[in-house]
Amino acid sequence: MTVPVITIDGPSASGKGTVAAQVAARLAFHYLDSGSLYRLLALHARRRGIAWDDEPALARAAAALPVEFSDGAVWLEGNDASQDIRAEEIGIGASKVGALPAVRAALLQRQRDFCEAPGLVTDGRDMGSVVFPDATLKIFLTASAEERASRRHKQLIGKGESANLAQIMQDIIDRDARDAARPVAPLRQEPDAFLLDTTELTIDQAVDKVLEWFEEKQASGH
């Protein structure tokens, strides 16, 4: 039996991770936050003294990355790294290492290994285009740059961190440009992906829409 896969791709701070995690919970499917793999690699490299542009060393590290997802947390070398990988600096590093072809190739099979029964919901930049091209349902989830910057700003302030809205906005614009321009797996909406703009939607509304589309796909036998 083919394991159903829902891919949710989109730009930074679009809310795709929150939506994907809730869809997975509602369906009792496995969940893969692919972006966390790149964040973990950036963090691992920083701790190991590997530069974020050292492609051969990063590819070797990616192939042997000691990572585990369990109990709602992300573990690196046996330690909970869930908070460490969310630092803004590590997010920028993840975008840089993720632009390297050898790194993406090294992490490709590791991501596919998460596809197990009863199903998988995964989010990232190239889940529907590269990692799971035959996914049951592909979503391209986005929101305006202004809305994404506002959400990220509120998130950081809520954590008690200092945050500059203008700087966050610029970082998002820069990351969008980097993601769209990279030579391997550039961020783009696939022709067979449903577009979900969450600028004016709540999280619950976005989750409900994904579930509605999934039910339609299942009913049509695709």
Swiss-Prot record:
**Record PANTHER family:** CYTIDYLATE KINASE (PTHR21299:SF2), CYTIDYLATE KINASE/PANTOATE-BETA-ALANINE LIGASE (PTHR21299)
Q: Which residues cross the membrane?
A: none
UniProt source species = Chromobacterium violaceum (strain ATCC 12472 / DSM 30191 / JCM 1249 / CCUG 213 / NBRC 12614 / NCIMB 9131 / NCTC 9757 / MK)
Compartments, record wording: Cytoplasm
The family database entries (CDD domains) matched by this protein are listed as: CMPK
Q: Could you say which EC number(s) this protein's record lists?
A: 2.7.4.25
| Highest taxon in the source lineage | Bacteria
Q: Name one GO biological process term.
A: pyrimidine nucleotide metabolic process
Gene Ontology terms, MF aspect: ATP binding; CMP kinase activity; dCMP kinase activity
Spell out the reaction equation it catalyses.
CMP + ATP = CDP + ADP; dCMP + ATP = dCDP + ADP
Residues given in the record as ATP binding sites? G10, P11, S12, A13, S14, G15, K16, G17, T18
Signal peptide boundaries: none
Q: Which InterPro entries match?
A: Cytidylate_kin, Cytidylate_kinase_dom, P-loop_NTPase
| Record Pfam families | Cytidylate_kin
UniProt lists the family membership as follows: Belongs to the cytidylate kinase family. Type 1 subfamily.
Q: What is the protein name stated in its UniProt record?
A: Cytidylate kinase
Keywords noted in UniProt: ATP-binding, Cytoplasm, Kinase, Nucleotide-binding, Transferase
